[in-house]
A protein has these predicted regions:
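A glycine-rich helix->loop->beta "capping" turn
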Residues: 40-41, 82-86, 96-125, 140, ...
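Helix N-cap at the beta1-alpha1 junction of Rossmann-like dinucleotide-binding domains, i.e.
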Residues: 72-75, 170
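Amphipathic alpha-helical dimer-interface segment in Rossmann-like NAD(P)H-dependent oxidoreductases
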Residues: 107, 120-143, 150-154, 184
Length: 198
């Protein structure tokens, strides 16, 4: 009788054990193993790069307020509504029209914290962004300029801002991830870097 009792208890124990999930392992950073998560504060972002859908979506998914420029008015407006961004139509991707679009965004939002631009426009856009921000009532303590291009452009130093270059070879998601990385508050010390995506 005692043997039968122990067998039944062991079967109940084995059935309960099979139904239980393994304990959830946590890494030292507090995340699940194999997952790295960052807290990304809500930022105001201007993307002045043609065909930067992956970058726009990455910042929208991170909870940022995003404005982007484009020449296709109907397609740009539809895309903006789909991802939750603001579309600013421009006639062409030249420094003058992009700076005017950036001024409109700055007037509406009162500040732009992150600027994503191409290497060819970087000097003009960065200079215009600095001018717009210098007119703010309080000096901003955070700012990022991320330059995307096939080759790096020379950019003058910017106080209280980080400038990084990403040299891309048609790898949209890799470029978008690098842009998010450089825009993190913890990456303020990373300055003047060139990242080549292979």
């Amino acid at each position: 009788m005692a043997d039968n009792y122990l067998e039944k208890k062991f079967e109940e124990y084995a059935a309960a054990k099979a139904g239980r999930r393994a304990p959830h392992r946590i890494s030292p950073a507090g995340n699940r193993q194999g997952v790295v998560e960052f807290k990304f504060p809500r930022r105001r972002v201007v993307v002045a790069v043609p065909d930067a859908d992956a970058v726009i979506e990455a910042f929208c998914n991170a909870g940022c307020q995003v404005a982007f420029c484009g020449t296709d008015i109907d397609g740009g407006q539809a895309y903006a509504e789909a991802v939750g961004a603001q579309f600013n139509p421009v006639n062409e991707f030249c420094a003058e029209t992009l700076c005017r679009a950036m001024s409109r965004v700055m007037k509406a939002w009162r500040d732009i914290e992150i600027v994503i631009c191409t290497a060819g426009m970087a000097q003009a856009i960065t200079s215009h962004w600095r001018t717009l921000r210098s007119a703010l009532p309080m000096e901003p303590d955070y700012g990022r300029v991320v330059v995307i291009g096939s080759e790096t452009a020379e950019i003058p130093a910017i106080p209280n801002a980080t400038v990084n270059d990403i040299v891309c070879r048609d790898i949209n998601n890799a470029v978008a991830s690098a842009c998010l990385f450089f825009a993190l508050p913890e990456c303020g010390a990373v300055s003047g870097q060139t990242i080549s995506t292979l």
